[in-house]
Amino acid sequence: MKVAVLGAGAWGTALAGHLAARHDTLLWARDAALIAGLQARHENSRYLDGIALPDALRYDADLGAALAHGAADDALCVIAAPVAGLRTLFGAMRDAGCVPAHVVWVCKGFEADTHLLPHQVIAAELPGQHSNGVLSGPSFAREVGLALPVALTVASTSAECRERTLAAFHHGAMRIYTGDDVVGVEVGGAVKNVLAIATGIADGLGLGLNARAALVTRGLAEMSRLGVALGGRAETFTGLTGLGDLILTATGDLSRNRTVGLQLAAGRSLNDILGALGHVAEGVRCAQAVLALARAQSIEMPITEAVCGVLFDGVAPRDAVSGLLRRDARAE
């Protein structure tokens, strides 16, 4: 199978390395210097340093060439760009007149200004593209790059997209499950990043494992309430893309969003944290969108609201925790 991976950050690079073990895989990035480094060293020293990539993996900075590689009926196009870049990338596909027949995205979050999920963005930009879906689940790029075991879920309303994604990814140390709850999978992937910031704050303040367990559990309730209101199914949030991804991102020290929370608790400014991180922290980008959607649906999301207070309103992390503890008692 031909596979084009669009986006050579840590996640796109790790997935491309996995795919290249079985398939004719091309990795694209708009940064020609990054591509030149990949071609010379077969290592992404900027985003996934120390991990050798397969010799068979090819690289290109020409979007047209990448789209042509992934646009055949028997090919797959994997979108590994951040949510913030989806609309531009889909628009470029449309303008180039080279829309892949089968598309799966691996980014997580809401579009910041429109509050749309990725499947809504592709519907707006590529209305004729119907074989598409989302691949998500508890996964750190570095561990995938090291070929450690991982389980992910592909969700699509297209059986052909599910089958093609399964055929592409389900080998080696990667296990793929299938489903059709696109909304539930996308909401879980977005909200867990915000909740991971909350858990990082609590851990950074030294509040203990009891507090961590409470935040994860009550955070899952927030995720599920919003997801169901937006059209997802409740059972999705107890699976890999909900609870599984939340546990990993909230507790794993490779988590960028957890790192943001830890650093906020240590008193660092958000700008300094993001500048030093060098990678996207989607929880910061989409926190306000999550809260706005919750308010529009009249859904209480106090943990998310507390995170937004710390990120954007100057609330001290310890004061945000105190605010949560002062909430009125209620039935679970």
From Swiss-Prot:
Pathway recorded for this protein: Membrane lipid metabolism; glycerophospholipid metabolism
Single GO molecular function: glycerol-3-phosphate dehydrogenase [NAD(P)+] activity
Coarse class of the protein's main subcellular location: cytoplasm
UniProt xrefs under Pfam families: NAD_Gly3P_dh_C, NAD_Gly3P_dh_N
Residues that hold sn-glycerol 3-phosphate according to the record: K108, G137, S139, K192, D245, S255, R256, N257
One Gene Ontology cellular component: cytosol
Positions of the catalytic residues: K192 (proton acceptor)
Family that this chain belongs to: Belongs to the NAD-dependent glycerol-3-phosphate dehydrogenase family.
Name the record gives this protein: Glycerol-3-phosphate dehydrogenase [NAD(P)+]
Organism: Burkholderia ambifaria (strain MC40-6)
